């Protein structure tokens, strides 16, 4: 459980930092995420950007990129059959999604879609982390008072976001 908490905290930091390809680059030298990015790279969870060699710490993370990070962090490899209308077997992220679905930490977005290239939201990340921990969130919804956009948090994610705040994964 401690290992899961460790990786979940790092993955949450990666989400907050944005897309985090790892290679020593000047664009991250003074960025708050540098120690997290460095650790994730050393653990083999993230790779350098082949095209730029930069970290781009303020860029967004897609849903499939976050799934890839989680699959690597937890060494998930077992696959499920999937049939999302927006995911084809020839897509580069097909196996990543098969693995994520098999391990039960992500669902589609409704209407038989996965939206793999969509930007991962805070509520989606919190829900994924909660499902990875397999906990029943117990944190009070008052934990969400720190967010000016709390009214925009989907009902399915409210308890997971509150728990992620309580656990210190997001703030």
Regions found by a protein language model. Give the residues of each.
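Feature responds to low-complexity, polar/acidic, surface-exposed segments characteristic
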Residues: 2-36, 42-96, 102-124, 129-158, ...
């Amino acid at each position: 459980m401690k290992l899961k908490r460790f990786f979940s905290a790092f993955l949450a930091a990666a989400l907050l930092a944005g897309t985090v390809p790892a290679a020593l680059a000047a664009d991250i030298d003074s960025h708050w995420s540098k120690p997290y990015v460095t650790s994730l790279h050393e653990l083999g969870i993230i790779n350098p950007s082949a095209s730029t060699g930069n970290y781009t710490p303020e860029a967004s993370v897609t849903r499939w990129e976050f799934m890839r990070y989680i699959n690597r962090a937890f060494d998930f490899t077992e696959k499920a059959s999937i049939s999302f209308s927006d995911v084809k077997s020839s897509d580069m992220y097909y196996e990543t999604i098969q693995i994520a679905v098999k391990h039960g930490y992500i669902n589609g977005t409704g209407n038989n879609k996965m939206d793999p290239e969509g930007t991962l939201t805070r509520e989606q990340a919190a829900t994924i982390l909660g499902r990875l921990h397999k906990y029943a969130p117990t944190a009070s919804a008052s934990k969400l008072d720190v967010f000016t956009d709390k009214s925009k948090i989907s009902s399915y994610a409210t308890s997971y976001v509150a728990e992620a705040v309580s656990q210190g994964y997001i703030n």
